[in-house]
UniProtKB/Swiss-Prot annotation:
Zn(2+) binds at C79, C96, C103. Catalyzes the hydrolysis of the adenine ring of phosphoribosyl-AMP. It comes from Neisseria meningitidis serogroup A / serotype 4A (strain DSM 15465 / Z2491). GO terms for cellular component: cytoplasm. It is found in: Cytoplasm. Homodimer. NCBIfam families: PRK00051.1. Belongs to the PRA-CH family. GO terms for biological process: L-histidine biosynthetic process. This is Phosphoribosyl-AMP cyclohydrolase. The gene is hisI.
Length: 131
């Protein structure tokens, strides 16, 4: 593990830090996930975004099943050290497991959440089943 990389990061009590994926060109927020120290190290080593799944209790590389990998162009750490922003190039233009560009596809309008972004590719086409 790279001590210089990790020492400034304030991982929570579960050993995780919030990781935000932002499109390097459009600046749109694509997704928010979690990283442990190993996922952060792997991200730096490979240049591709790796995360830690709280539900599956394991590290994973974005796109390992779908092919929608995230090439990291820049890593940024916030002033408190408890959140990371990755400026990324999104392979295939789809970051969300629902087949949308972004996981942030719902907009609050008139007292309700409305779906604002279209599905670019059906989940079943991406994963072979509903993810």
């Amino acid at each position: 593990m790279d001590k210089n990389l990790l020492e400034a990061v304030k991982f929570d009590e579960k050993g995780l830090v919030c990781a935000i994926a932002q499109d390097a060109e459009t600046k749109r927020i694509l997704m928010v996930a979690w990283m442990n120290a190993e996922a952060l190290q792997k991200t730096v080593e490979t240049g591709f975004a790796h995360y830690y799944s709280r539900s599956r209790q394991k590290q994973w590389m974005k796109g390992e099943e779908s092919g929608h990998t995230q090439k990291v162009r820049e890593l940024r750490l916030d002033c408190d050290g408890d959140a990371i922003v990755m400026l990324i190039a999104q392979n295939g233009g789809i970051a969300c497991h629902t087949g949308r560009e972004s996981c942030f596809y719902k907009v609050w309008r008139g007292g309700a959440w409305e779906t604002a972004d279209a599905v670019l590719k059906d989940e079943k086409e991406i994963y072979g089943s509903t993810h």
